[in-house]
Curated annotation (Swiss-Prot):
Principal location: cytoplasm
BAR domain: residues covered: 18-249
Annotated segments matching region Required for dimerization upon membrane association: 60-87
Modified residues (Phosphothreonine): 298
Annotated protein name in UniProt: Endophilin-A2
Region of interest called Disordered, as start-end residue ranges on this chain: 243-308
Pfam families named in the record: BAR, SH3_1
Family recorded in the similarity comment: Belongs to the endophilin family.
Modified residues (Phosphotyrosine): 315
GO molecular function: lipid binding
Segment forming the signal sequence: none
Length: 368
């Protein structure tokens, strides 16, 4: 920084101290300017909070949001183009219904109904994904751009204006001790910054119909989603009612127990409900503990030496996305990195990946 720049910073700091501590009066801005500044501040707060609440509305599960953010970050680091999407609750419910519907089979009324409902839930999840994309493009992104560009630019102008005001007030207070030309230049710069800040705030407030248009796009996307959701659920309701009518019109099958077989109670080995029992092996003194010379070892995964960062799995973890590391309860995992407060990166049997911190107990922590 040049000598002139250092002097200017000293002037501003000196004036600020005299106003805050000494109670000195600074140049007052007009009421219209203050009113615009207040409206811009309220607009900035409104846009910031509405953005956060809209994301919560579209993706209500905070754990899933955090996991998705982490996976997207990892995908960018690895140069992967396709990022995993948010796991819609309708899709998870649909997969559950379809899985159990297939297990029950086609002869089960409930199984067939679960398959119908599961397919409809998956369609609802697809419609919800479309809502997410539509709202992001036409509502979230424009508001985020407003925050990052227009509002940020206004804050820059206001900060610059405050700095020039302090410089002008300091020099005005020392009038007669500094050249008149220097005081005149300070006043011109202050007036110039005030005009620039005023113009940018006026433009933002006068064009707020753009935000109304973006809000309208949000409502249109919601309406389209709910129309499609109602159509899908109406179709599902008709299918289930038709299944109920068909089931009630079919004759009921009566249960006919199979005839009991005659039980032969002559042999004690077959006295266990008619089923033959396996003969118990005889234990002799010569053979009963002979095998204890070589204890039986259960197969286990290779364990890393405990002098390096590692952890023990408390529960089974099934990976749902690329890059995650699956393991079973009791596995010992080598720790290589901590992604954030919720996720570790580690290795098991030569495989590397990410896994949640809450699923493991740290044995040897990572170096700080």
């Amino acid at each position: 920084m040049s000598v002139a720049g250092l002097k200017k910073q000293f002037y501003k700091a000196s004036q600020l101290v005299s106003e805050k501590v000494g109670g000195a009066e600074g140049t007052k801005l007009d009421d219209d300017f203050k009113e615009m500044e207040k409206k811009v501040d309220v607009t900035s707060k409104a846009v910031t909070e509405v953005l956060a609440r809209t994301i919560e509305y579209l993706q209500p599960n905070p754990a899933s949001r955090a996991k998705l953010t982490m996976l997207n970050t990892v995908s960018k680091i690895r140069g992967q183009v396709k990022n995993p999407g948010y796991p819609q609750s309708e899709g998870l419910l649909g997969e559950c219904m379809i899985r159990h519907g297939k297990e029950l089979g086609g002869e089960s009324n409930f199984g067939d109904a679960l398959l119908d409902a599961g397919e409809s839930m998956k369609r609802l999840a697809e419609v919800k994904d479309s809502l997410d994309i539509e709202v992001k493009q036409n509502f979230i992104d424009p508001l985020q751009n407003l925050c990052d560009k227009d509002l940020k630019e206004i804050q820059h102008h206001l900060k610059k204006l405050e700095g020039r005001r302090l410089d002008f007030d300091y020099k005005k207070k020392r009038q007669g001790k500094i050249p008149d030309e220097e005081l005149r230049q300070a006043m011109e710069k202050f007036e110039e910054s005030k005009e620039v800040a005023e113009t940018s705030m006026h433009h933002l407030l006068e064009t707020d119909i753009e935000q109304v248009s973006q809000l309208s796009a949000l409502v249109d996307a919601q309406l389209d989603y709910h129309r499609q959701a109602v159509q899908i659920l109406d179709e599902l309701a008709d299918k289930l009612k038709r299944r109920m009518r068909e089931a009630s019109s079919r004759p009921k099958r009566e249960y006919k127990p199979k005839p009991r077989e005659l039980l032969d109670l002559g042999e004690p080995e077959q006295s266990n409900g008619g089923f033959p029992c396996a003969a118990a092996p005889k234990i002799t003194a010569s053979s009963s503990f002979r095998s204890s010379d070589k204890p039986v070892r259960t197969p286990s995964r290779s364990m890393p030496p405990l002098d390096q960062p590692s952890c023990k799995a408390l529960y089974d973890f099934e990976p749902e996305n690329d890059g995650e590391l699956g393991f079973h309860e009791g596995d010992i995992i080598t720790l290589t990195n901590q992604i954030d407060e919720n996720w570790y990166e580690g290795m098991l049997d030569g495989q590397s990946g990410f896994f949640p911190l809450s699923y493991v107990e740290v044995l040897v922590p990572l170096p700080q």
